[in-house]
C-alpha cells in the first residue's frame, strides 16, 4: 500500500490513509470535538491564523484545522485515488 499525501493548504500535508472525516467547523458538536482535542493536546492548527474552514479527523484521534474548504480537501483526496487507480492499470 503506497502512502498517499493530501495538501491541506499552505504547504501542509497529511496522510490520506489516516483520514477518517473531513467536516465543516460550524456545528456545535464539531466545535466541542475541537475544544476537547485542544484540551487533550491532540489539536493541530494548520490555518496560519486564517479562518478555519475544514476540520480533519484522523484515525489516531488527532484533529487538524485547515483554512481550505472541506470540498476542496475531498476533491484532492478523490483525485489522488483516481490517479492511483490509473497508475495501477498501467502496471
From Swiss-Prot:
Organism domain of life: Bacteria
Xref: InterPro entries: RemA-like
Family classification: Belongs to the RemA family.
PANTHER family: REGULATORY PROTEIN SSL2874-RELATED, REGULATORY PROTEIN TM_1690-RELATED
NCBIfam families assigned to the protein according to its UniProt record, in alphabetical order: MtxBflmRegRemA, PRK04323.1
Official protein name in the record: Putative regulatory protein CBO2514/CLC_2370
Organism: Clostridium botulinum (strain Hall / ATCC 3502 / NCTC 13319 / Type A)
Amino acid at each position: 500500500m503506497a502512502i498517499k499525501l493530501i495538501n491541506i493548504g499552505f504547504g501542509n500535508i497529511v496522510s490520506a490513509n489516516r483520514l477518517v472525516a473531513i467536516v465543516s467547523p460550524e456545528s456545535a458538536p464539531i466545535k466541542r470535538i475541537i475544544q476537547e482535542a485542544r484540551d487533550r493536546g491532540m489539536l493541530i492548527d494548520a490555518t496560519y491564523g486564517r479562518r478555519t474552514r475544514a476540520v480533519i479527523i484522523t484515525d489516531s484521534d488527532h484533529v487538524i484545522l485547515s483554512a481550505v474548504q472541506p470540498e476542496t480537501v475531498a476533491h484532492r483526496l478523490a483525485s489522488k485515488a483516481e490517479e492511483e487507480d490509473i497508475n495501477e492499470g498501467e502496471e
